[in-house]
C-alpha cells in the first residue's frame, strides 16, 4: 500500500514538472483529427496514460522526507518545472508544425507508456505496480535498444559524493524527442535521470561524507576546448552505462564513493584543486544487515523503511588505561621507614598501606615511621611483596656490636698486657672520700671544693709504691646518683668509704647497690679512725645487714681502718688494692683501636667542648677520629690531670681531650674510627635517626609551652619556669634530677632549657619571653649579657653548692602560691537606732557589746544569722567627735561605706584580715 502511494506521488510530480496535463489536452485534440490509420497500440497507450493522469489527485504534493529515494528531494520542483516550461515554449516557437507532421508515423511506433518513461528516466523498479509479462518486457527492452537514435541521449552524471549537486548540473544534456501529431512538430526536453537519494544519518550527511577518498595521482588539467571536443565520446560511454543499468536491477547495498577526476572538474567548469595527501584514519563501516523480525512477518515493513531510529547510539567507550606498573615482589628496606617512603618503594599509594594498617587496628598517617620489623613484613605480604630488613647501614653506624670485654676475650694472648686497676671511691657525703684520695696522692684537692663537698667526678692516675692506680672520685651527695652509677660501671674495684663514727648512711647503701649492679669487687675503708668515737664494730654489723660480711667476722669483704688526716692505714689500703688487681688479672690490648667512656664534659671558654674520658682498651693518639653517640670529633689536644700535654694515652688512663663537634653526655662510650670523614658520616646518620624518633614522639604527644601552661592552669597549679646552666654535663644532670624530685600539690617546676656553659644572651631572652628564672650552677654570666639582664628584668640565681640551689628553688615555688586570707574577730556592736543625714545618709546608732571597734577594721552586717553586707567603716563618731576606736559598752555612731539599708536590731561585726603564706 505504501509503495503504491509513493508511486502515485511520483507520478503527480512528473506530470506537474513536464506540464503533462496541457500536453494531454492538446494531444487529445490532435488525436480526434487524425485519420483512422492509428494503431491500436497507440490508442491503448494514450488511453492508459490518460486514465492514469486523470486519476491522479490535483492536490499539492505532500512534503517529501529528506531520506526519500525520490530524485526531487534534492532540488525544488517549482524551479525545475519553470525551467522545463520555458524551454518547451521556446522550442515550440522555433520549430514548425510541418516538421512534426513528417515524423508522426515514425514516432507512433516508438510511443511508450508513462510507466516505461519513468523507468527509463529514474531507473525505478515497479515491483508492486501492474506490469506485463516478463517476455513482453524483454521484447520491449530490445525494441528500445534498436529504436534509440541520436536525438535521444541520456547522460548519467558522475557523482563524486552523495551530497546534493548544484542546480545547474541537474540537467546537463538536453535532447529533444520529436513527436508529430497532425503535422505539428515539438521538441520535449527530457530531464536527466538522477541517482536515487541515499539514506542520511542524524547529522543530515551520509557516512561517505566522513570518509576521505584514497589519494590519487596528480591530476592533469586539460583545456576546456579539448573537453568540448570529447564530449560526444563521453556521451556515448554514458549511454552504454545507462543501457546496462536498464537491464540490471540497481543494487541497494553499500556503494563505494566515486572519485572525482580532473575531467569531471573540467566538465563542471571547476578548477582542479591542489593534491593533498591524507590518511584514512577511520575505516569505512561494513554494511549493516537487518534481521527478520515481527514486522516483516506481518508484512508491515517495506524495503526502504528507515531503520535508523531503532539503532542504539554507541556510547563512547571510556579510554580506561590499564595499570602497567610493575610492582616488586621482593624489597629491602631500612628501618625506621615512613609510610610514604615504603609505599613509594612498593609502587603503591600511601592510602593503600594506611587502609591495611587501619584494618589491623593500627592508626597511622603518611609521615609516621614504621619501626617494627614484623609489621613491615606482614604489610608487604598483604600486597605480595617480600620485605627484608637491611641491617648493613645499622652495622656500619654501630661500628661494632662487641663490648670491650668481648674484644679482649677474642684478642691474641700475646698482645694482652697488664693494665692498672681503675678504683672508684664512693660513699656518703662528708665521709672523707676526697680527703682520703688527697692523702694517697699527697695533694690538697678537698680544700678547693665549694662547701667542702665534691660535686664533680674526678679522675687521676696515681703512682704508688705498689704500682699505678687510676682513681675516680665520685660525689657523695644524693643528687649525684647517676655519677656514682657511671663510676661503678667503668671501674674494677670500688672503695666504699665509711665514717667510723657515723656508720652506713643512705648514699653508702646506694653505692653498695651500684657496685653490685656493675659486678664490681667492694673494698671497705673505715675512715676517721683517729676520732675518739670511732666504732668499727657498728660498721661491721651494718655491712653484715647489707650481705657484706667483713673479714674480721669470717667473711670475704676486705675492710681497712684508715685516717685521711694522720695517714694511718693508707699503705695497707694500697696493698689490698694491688692484691685485688692481681687476683683479677686485669689486661688490655694497647695495639687495638681505642675505646672508652666519657666521665665528664664541660664547655671551656677558649677551648670549646672539653671531655674527660677514660681509655679502657687500646691506645688513643693525638689526631684520632672519635665517635661519641650522635657527635664526632678529632683529638686536637690531650692533657692529664696536671695539665701536662700528652701525645697518646694507654689503657686505664683518664685524659682531657678537645676538638669535639659538641658536648657529649657523661657515660657515653667512644670509639676510634678510620678517619674524620667516616666519623662525620656515622654521626650524621645517627643524628638523623634520632631526629626521626624525636619527631615520632612529638607526633604521639605534642607538647608545647602553651599546652603545659594550659594544663597547669586547668589543674590549678602554679608553674615555675627555669633555665638551667651548669659548668659540666654531670653537674647539670645531677641538678636537673634534684630539681625534678621536688614534689608539690600546689606548684610544679618546668625546666624549659638546660645547657653547659655560661649564662648567655639567648638564655636571658628566653627567660624574659617565658617569664622564667635563670639558675646557674658553678658558672657565671657572660659580660655582654649582664646589661640585657638589667634591661629585661630577668632574675638570675647563681649557686656553687647544689643543696643551696635546691632550697632557693623551693622558696621561689612557694612564692608563686597565693597567700591565704585569715579573719580575726575584733568586736561586735548592736544597732539601737538609725538617723538620716542629708549629707551622709543613714547613720547607725550602735552600742559596742563585745570587744572593740576600730576605724580601720573590716565589718560585716548581720541580720539574724545572715550576712547582709561586707565592707569598711566610712566614719566612726562618739557623740559629735571623730574617734579611732570605741571600747565595749560605749555608744557610737557608725557610717558604713556605700551602704544605707540598715535596720534597728542589726549586728555589726568588726574583724581584721591577715594573709598567711602557703607551704609546698
Curated annotation (Swiss-Prot):
InterPro entries for this protein: EF-G-like_DII, EFTu-like_2, IF2_II, IF2_N, P-loop_NTPase, Small_GTP-bd, T_Tr_GTP-bd_dom, TF_IF2_bacterial-like
Principal location listed in the UniProt entry: cytoplasm
Localisation per UniProt entry: Cytoplasm
UniProt entry tagged with the keyword Hydrolase: no
Segments for region (G4): 527-530
Renumbered residue ranges of the record's region Disordered: 27-112, 143-325
Function: One of the essential components for the initiation of protein synthesis. Protects formylmethionyl-tRNA from spontaneous hydrolysis and promotes its binding to the 30S ribosomal subunits. Also involved in the hydrolysis of GTP during the formation of the 70S ribosomal complex.
Protein name: Translation initiation factor IF-2
Organism: Protochlamydia amoebophila (strain UWE25)
Lineage: Bacteria, Pseudomonadati, Chlamydiota, Chlamydiia, Parachlamydiales
Amino acid at each position: 500500500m505504501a509503495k503504491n502511494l509513493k508511486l502515485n506521488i511520483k507520478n503527480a510530480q512528473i506530470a506537474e514538472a513536464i506540464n503533462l496535463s496541457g500536453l494531454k489536452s492538446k494531444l487529445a485534440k490532435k488525436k480526434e483529427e487524425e485519420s483512422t490509420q492509428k494503431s491500436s497500440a497507440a490508442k491503448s497507450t494514450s488511453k492508459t496514460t490518460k486514465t492514469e493522469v486523470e486519476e491522479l489527485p490535483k492536490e499539492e504534493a505532500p512534503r517529501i522526507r529528506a531520506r526519500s529515494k525520490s530524485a526531487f528531494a534534492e532540488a525544488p520542483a517549482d524551479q525545475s518545472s519553470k525551467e522545463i516550461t520555458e524551454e518547451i515554449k521556446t522550442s515550440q516557437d522555433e520549430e514548425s508544425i510541418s516538421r512534426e507532421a513528417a515524423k508522426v508515423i515514425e514516432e507512433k511506433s516508438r510511443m511508450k507508456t508513462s510507466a516505461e518513461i519513468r523507468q527509463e528516466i529514474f531507473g525505478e523498479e515497479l515491483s508492486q505496480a501492474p506490469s506485463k509479462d516478463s517476455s513482453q518486457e524483454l521484447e520491449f527492452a530490445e525494441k528500445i535498444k534498436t529504436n534509440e537514435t541520436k536525438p535521444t541521449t541520456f547522460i548519467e552524471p558522475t557523482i563524486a559524493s552523495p551530497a546534493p549537486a548544484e542546480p545547474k548540473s541537474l540537467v546537463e544534456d538536453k535532447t529533444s524527442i520529436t513527436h508529430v501529431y497532425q503535422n505539428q512538430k515539438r521538441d520535449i526536453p527530457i530531464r536527466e535521470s538522477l541517482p536515487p537519494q541515499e539514506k542520511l544519518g542524524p547529522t543530515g550527511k551520509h557516512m561517505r561524507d566522513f570518509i576521505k577518498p584514497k589519494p590519487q595521482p596528480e591530476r592533469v588539467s586539460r583545456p576546456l576546448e579539448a573537453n568540448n571536443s570529447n564530449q560526444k565520446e563521453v556521451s556515448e560511454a554514458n549511454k552504454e552505462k545507462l543501457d546496462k543499468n536498464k537491464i540490471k536491477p540497481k543494487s541497494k547495498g553499500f556503494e563505494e564513493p566515486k572519485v572525482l577526476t580532473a575531467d569531471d572538474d573540467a566538465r563542471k567548469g571547476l578548477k582542479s584543486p591542489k593534491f593533498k595527501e591524507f590518511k584514512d584514519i577511520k575505516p569505512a563501516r561494513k554494511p549493516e544487515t537487518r534481521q527478520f523480525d515481527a514486522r516483516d512477518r506481518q508484512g508491515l515493513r517495506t524495503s526502504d523503511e528507515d531503520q535508523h531510529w531503532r539503532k542504539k547510539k554507541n556510547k563512547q567507550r571510556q579510554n580506561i588505561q590499564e595499570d602497567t606498573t610493575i610492582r616488586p615482589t621482593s624489597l629491602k628496606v631500612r628501618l625506621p621507614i615512613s609510610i610514604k617512603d615504603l609505599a613509594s618503594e612498593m609502587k603503591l599509594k600511601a592510602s593503600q598501606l594506611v587502609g591495611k594498617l587501619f584494618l589491623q587496628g593500627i592508626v597511622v598517617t603518611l609521615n609516621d615511621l614504621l619501626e617494627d620489623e614484623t609489621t613491615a613484613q606482614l604489610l608487604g605480604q598483604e600486597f605480595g611483596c617480600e620485605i627484608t630488613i637491611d641491617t648493613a647501614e645499622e652495622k656500619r653506624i654501630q661500628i661494632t656490636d662487641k663490648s670491650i670485654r668481648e674484644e679482649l676475650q677474642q684478642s691474641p694472648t700475646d698482645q694482652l698486657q697488664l693494665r692498672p686497676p681503675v678504683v672508684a671511691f664512693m660513699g656518703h657525703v662528708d665521709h672523707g672520700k676526697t680527703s682520703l684520695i688527697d692523702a694517697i696522692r699527697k695533694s690538697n684537692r678537698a680544700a678547693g671544693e665549694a662547701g667542702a663537698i665534691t660535686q664533680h667526678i674526678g679522675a687521676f692516675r696515681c703512682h704508688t709504691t705498689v704500682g699505678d692506680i687510676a682513681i675516680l672520685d665520685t660525689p657523695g651527695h644524693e643528687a649525684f646518683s647517676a655519677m656514682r652509677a657511671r663510676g661503678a660501671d667503668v671501674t674494677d674495684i670500688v672503695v666504699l668509704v665509711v665514717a667510723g663514727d657515723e656508720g652506713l648512711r643512705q648514699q653508702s647503701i646506694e653505692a653498695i647497690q651500684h657496685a653490685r649492679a656493675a659486678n664490681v669487687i667492694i673494698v671497705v675503708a673505715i675512715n676517721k679512725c683517729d676520732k675518739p668515737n670511732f666504732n668499727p664494730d657498728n660498721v661491721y654489723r651494718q655491712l653484715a645487714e647489707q650481705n657484706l660480711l667483713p673479714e674480721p667476722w669470717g667473711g670475704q669483704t676486705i675492710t681497712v681502718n684508715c685516717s685521711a688526716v694522720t695517714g694511718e692505714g693508707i699503705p695497707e689500703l694500697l696493698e689490698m688494692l694491688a692484691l685485688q688487681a692481681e687476683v683479677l688479672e686485669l689486661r688490655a690490648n694497647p695495639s687495638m683501636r681505642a675505646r672508652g667512656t666519657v666521665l665528664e664534659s664541660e664547655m671551656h671558654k677558649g677551648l670549646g667542648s672539653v671531655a674527660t674520658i677514660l681509655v679502657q682498651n687500646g691506645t688513643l693518639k693525638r689526631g684520632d677520629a672519635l665517635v661519641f653517640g650522635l657527635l664526632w670529633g678529632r683529638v686536637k689536644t690531650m692533657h692529664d690531670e696536671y695539665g701536662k700535654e700528652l701525645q697518646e694515652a694507654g689503657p686505664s688512663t683518664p685524659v682531657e681531650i678537645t676538638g669535639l663537634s659538641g658536648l657529649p653526655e657523661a657515660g657515653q662510650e667512644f670509639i676510634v674510627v678510620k678517619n674524620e670523614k667516616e666519623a662525620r658520616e656515622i654521626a650524621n646518620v645517627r643524628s638523623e635517626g634520632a631526629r626521626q624518633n624525636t619527631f615520632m614522639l612529638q607526633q604521639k604527644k605534642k607538647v608545647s609551652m602553651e599546652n603545659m601552661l594550659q594544663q597547669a592552669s586547668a589543674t590549678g597549679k602554679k608553674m615555675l619556669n627555669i633555665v638551667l646552666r651548669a659548668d659540666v654535663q654531670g653537674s647539670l644532670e645531677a641538678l636537673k634530677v634534684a630539681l625534678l624530685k621536688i614534689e608539690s600539690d600546689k606548684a610544679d617546676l618546668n625546666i624549659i632549657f638546660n645547657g653547659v656553659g655560661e649564662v648567655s644572651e639567648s638564655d636571658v631572652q628566653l627567660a624574659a619571653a617565658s617569664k622564667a628564672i635563670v639558675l646557674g650552677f658553678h658558672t657565671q654570666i657572660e659580660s655582654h649579657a649582664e646589661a640585657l639582664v638589667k634591661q629585661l628584668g630577668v632574675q638570675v640565681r647563681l649557686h656553687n653548692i647544689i643543696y643551696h640551689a635546691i632550697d632557693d628553688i623551693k622558696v621561689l615555688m612557694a612564692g608563686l602560691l597565693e597567700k591565704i586570707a585569715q579573719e580575726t574577730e575584733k568586736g561586735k556592736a548592736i544597732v539601737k537606732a538609725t538617723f538620716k543625714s542629708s549629707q551622709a545618709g543613714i547613720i547607725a546608732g550602735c552600742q559596742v557589746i563585745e570587744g572593740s571597734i576600730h576605724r580601720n577594721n573590716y565589718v560585716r552586717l548581720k541580720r539574724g544569722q545572715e550576712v547582709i553586707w561586707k565592707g569598711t567603716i566610712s566614719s566612726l563618731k562618739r557623740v559629735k567627735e571623730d574617734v579611732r576606736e570605741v571600747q565595749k559598752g560605749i555608744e557610737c555612731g557608725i557610717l558604713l561605706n556605700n551602704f544605707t539599708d540598715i535596720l534597728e536590731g542589726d549586728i555589726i561585726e568588726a574583724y581584721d584580715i591577715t594573709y598567711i603564706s602557703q607551704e609546698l
